[in-house]
Structures are given as C-alpha cells and as structure tokens.
C-alpha cells in the first residue's frame, strides 16, 4: 500500500473521532441532561486528545514524509498531502495536554453560555471565557 493510501486510512480514523465529537456536541446542545456535563467534557477531551495524538504521531509524520517523496498520482492527492503537512505542523505546536484541557474547558463554557444567556447574566460565563482566553 502506498504511503498516501496509508495516510488516507489515518485521516479517516481522525475523521471518525472528530465526527463523533460533533455528534456529542449536538447532543449536548439538544438532549443531554445537565448532570451529564462533566462526563461529556471528559468524553470530548478524550476524543480530541486521541485525534491530536494520531495526527501528530511519529507514524503519521513518517508516512507523510514518504508520501511527499513519492509523486502523488493526481493534483488533488498532492493538495491533500500539502494540507495534511500544514495541519500536522500546526498541531505539533500545541501540547497534547493543552489540546485536551481546551476541549474540556470549551465544553463547560458552552453549557455556561447557554445558562448565562437564558438568564441574561454574562457574569456566569465570564470565568469560562477568561479561562479559554488565558
């Protein structure tokens, strides 16, 4: 199997993780009981961490190096390889722990924003925003 096709399998796995995050996020906004927030934040953090680890893994980087040296078959494949290189370079700059903490904080912040907006009380959301921006 070519390096490009092996990369496609990894990207598919990352897509499964991120699309699962999207479903959990939608559930949080529509049906999730408020008492499930802490567990949902842990779920989101876990999935985000797994996707980040997979994207920045040594295996993925080695396959990308190989895919760049093997001539991609089509212009779209070449664009995919360039885009993946950009994504990996960006992701490598962020420590895994920070990525997971940001995900967990954002999940809590989203719930706080909904409550603060319903009560027209921004002070309920301010600490979450401050933490996200720090």
Label every PLM stretch briefly.
Residues 1-134:
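A well-structured
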């Amino acid at each position: 199997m070519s390096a490009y096709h092996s990369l496609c399998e990894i990207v598919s796995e990352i897509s499964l993780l991120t699309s699962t995050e999207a479903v959990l996020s939608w559930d949080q906004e529509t049906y999730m009981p408020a008492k499930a927030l802490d567990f949902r934040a842990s779920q989101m953090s876990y999935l985000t961490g797994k996707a980040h680890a997979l994207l920045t893994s040594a295996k993925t980087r080695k396959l990308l190096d190989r895919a760049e040296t093997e001539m991609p078959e089509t212009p779209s494949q070449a664009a995919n390889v360039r885009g993946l290189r950009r994504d990996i370079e960006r992701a490598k700059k962020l420590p895994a722990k920070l990525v997971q903490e940001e995900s967990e904080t954002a999940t809590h912040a989203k719930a706080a924003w909904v409550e603060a907006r319903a009560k027209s009380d921004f002070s309920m959301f301010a600490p979450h925003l401050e933490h996200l921006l720090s």
